[in-house]
């Protein structure tokens, strides 16, 4: 059984027991979160596709960790001008473990 749900402007395909990195959620470690925006739920041959969401479907998860991703370097280089600008960015994320899918 797997489901596709939406969180942080992105869609995630998950199954039970899987650990997923999402955009940062303001929750404490160990907290339980429910995602009601389930776009699709598949249970064997039974496929439910929402328009836009599946009614009554939700994905339940537990917050495992909060953290920051790998550094992305931004470089602006102006040729022949002896000018260069460098900047870095690390995006915050929330790591959750999927504990249940209900349809």
From Swiss-Prot:
Example GO BP: translation
GO molecular function, one term: rRNA binding
SUPFAM superfamilies: L21p-like
Coiled coil (residue ranges): none
Classification via PROSITE patterns: RIBOSOMAL_L21 (PS01169)
rRNA processing as UniProt keyword: no
GO cellular component terms listed in the entry, alphabetical order: cytoplasm; ribonucleoprotein complex; ribosome
Top-rank taxon: Bacteria
Alphabetized UniProt keyword annotations: Ribonucleoprotein, Ribosomal protein, RNA-binding, rRNA-binding
Pfam families in alphabetical order: Ribosomal_L21p
Function: This protein binds to 23S rRNA in the presence of protein L20.
Subunit-level organization: Part of the 50S ribosomal subunit. Contacts protein L20.
Listed NCBIfam families: L21
Homology family: Belongs to the bacterial ribosomal protein bL21 family.
Stated name of the protein: Large ribosomal subunit protein bL21
Provenance organism: Haemophilus influenzae (strain ATCC 51907 / DSM 11121 / KW20 / Rd)
Gene expressing this chain: rplU
């Amino acid at each position: 059984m797997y489901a596709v749900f939406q969180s942080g402007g992105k869609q995630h395909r998950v199954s039970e027991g899987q650990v997923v990195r999402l955009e940062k959620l303001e929750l404490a470690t160990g907290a339980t979160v429910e995602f009601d925006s389930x776009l699709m739920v598949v249970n064997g041959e039974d496929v439910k596709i929402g328009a836009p969401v599946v009614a009554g479907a939700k994905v339940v998860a537990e917050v495992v960790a909060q953290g920051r991703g790998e550094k992305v370097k931004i470089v602006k280089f102006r040729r022949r001008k002896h000018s260069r600008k460098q900047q870095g960015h690390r995006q915050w994320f929330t790591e959750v473990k999927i504990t249940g899918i209900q349809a």
